[in-house]
Amino acid sequence: MPLIVHISDLHVSELGFDEDVFIKAVAEINAINPDMIILTGDLTNNGYYNEFVQATKYLGMFDAPLFAVPGNHDARNLGYETFEELIGECSWKLTKDDEFVVIGLDSSSPDISSGNVGRPQHLWMEHQLDQCVIDELFSIVALHHHVI
């Protein structure tokens, strides 16, 4: 069975981000040698370019592959564009392994804390989950906001 680590809400910024705590967390995560790390948004606090640059340096400290979806803080100040440039695709995405599938949804909107998954994205997710049942794969749906 694969070992997957979930992290969220790092809020990398000049103020309020505790680098020492993060570095300790990275060491503990790397020590357990996970197969994947899933990051479910709010990597940055304000979506500023310099926050994303700083965040990519921190994320580079992980030994395992990273699967990331954006949060509402990442979408601020055109951060969704920087997310795609430096982290990866913001929109719906999928990664498959022999044992599991991670389905990533984008529930973020700038300055809207409640989040939203629209109908087209929901239908796409349903299709992916149906395929997971057919293929008998363990499935994980990753998004920043709560489902209910």
Please provide the spans of the model-predicted regions.
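N-terminal active-site segment of His-dependent metallophosphoesterases
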Residues: 1-54
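Beta-strand-turn-beta hairpins that frame and shape the catalytic cleft
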Residues: 1-5, 94-104, 130-138
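Active-site neighborhood of phospho(di)ester-bond hydrolases with catalytic His/Asp-centered motifs
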Residues: 7-8, 36-42, 66-72, 106, ...
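Surface-exposed cleft-lining segments at the edges of enzyme active sites
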Residues: 12-14, 43, 108-119, 148
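Metal-dependent catalytic neighborhoods of phosphoester/phosphodiester hydrolases
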Residues: 15-18, 41-60, 75-88, 114-115
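His/acidic metal-ligating clusters that form di-metal
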Residues: 27-36, 115-148
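A short helix->loop->beta-strand "cap" motif at the edges of active sites that frequently abuts
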Residues: 62-66, 136-137
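Active-site neighborhood of divalent metal-dependent phosphoester bond hydrolases
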Residues: 64-91, 98-103, 107-111, 119-120
